[in-house]
Regions:
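Internal glycine-rich alpha/beta core junctions
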Residues: 1-242
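Acidic, proline/serine/threonine- and glycine-rich low-complexity intrinsically disordered segments
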Residues: 245-247
Length: 258
């Protein structure tokens, strides 16, 4: 080939979709009438090749679920500390003000603590998943590398499905903290809810993730990888079972700090 351009392929973007969220991402209507397709790789191996990309994308979508959930929490926490309304049931907290911050109210605290615990636990999960992926690629011991790869595969549908399901719920809770303000565009909370909703759908719906987990990942090695994970949990519990319990007073002092 001399590098001369051939005839233009019959492919065109005919319009933009109008979506619920992620408006910064242009989703186009594509027209492929009479387009010529080129085979990439060996015949009948496309699905296998595609899943190399899909598995990476599913982890990225899980990170999206965590990221949007966390910024929604940070905004909700700031608002709950700043917005004053009513008095705490346990007694006046800020006598110099006409009302206490809504942070003192039980249901607001419940929502914020649910978001905080989810975000922190999920961040640890993401770190562990990244470690397994690194070990699968770089671990010198082939047995350990294979085990890390199996654990990463087992948790991929969990990272995608569970994290985005709960991330959406956390964003709804963050919006709820704002009350009526959360429903108004200028406060930004409704955008988090709209933007995170897609994470439960694309790169394989979360129902498909459940099928993948139960139908493929758990049964692929007759539960051997799940047993490895179970032993890891048991070892962790054994190593920390003698730790001094954290007092409720200590928890209350730190539970809603950013």
């Amino acid at each position: 080939a001399d590098g001369t351009l051939g005839a233009a392929n019959s492919l065109a973007a005919t319009g933009l979709e109008h979506k619920m969220g992620i408006h910064g991402n242009s989703t186009c209507v594509m027209l492929f009438d009479n387009a010529v397709g080129e085979l990439v790789g060996a015949p009948h191996q496309g699905l296998r090749a595609m899943f190399t990309m899909m598995n990476q994308a599913r982890l990225g979508v899980g990170i999206q679920g965590l990221g949007v959930s966390d910024i929604a929490y940070q905004n909700a926490l700031f608002y709950a500390k700043d917005r004053i309304q009513g008095r705490a049931l346990s007694g006046v907290k800020e006598a110099d003000k006409p009302a206490d911050p809504i942070l003192v109210h039980g249901d607001v605290r419940r929502m914020l603590l649910s978001q905080k615990s989810f975000n922190e636990g999920t961040r640890a999960l993401m770190g562990q998943q990244a470690l397994w992926l690194d070990q699968a690629e770089r671990e010198a011991d082939p047995v350990k590398a294979k085990q890390a790869s199996a654990l990463a595969a087992l948790f991929t549908p969990i990272v995608k499905g569970f994290v985005t399901d709960q991330g959406f719920k956390a964003c709804v809770d963050a919006q709820q903290v704002y009350g009526g303000h959360g429903y108004i565009n200028e406060w930004g909370m409704e955008q988090f809810v709209r933007d995170i909703r897609i994470a439960m759908i694309y790169e394989g719906t979360n129902g498909v993730q459940a099928l993948d987990l139960v139908g493929r990942k758990l049964l692929a090695d007759k539960g051997a990888t799940l047993q490895v994970w179970s032993e890891m949990v048991k070892q962790f519990i054994g190593q920390h079972s003698a730790n001094e319990p954290v007092s409720y007073t200590h928890l209350r002092a730190h539970e809603t700090k950013a």
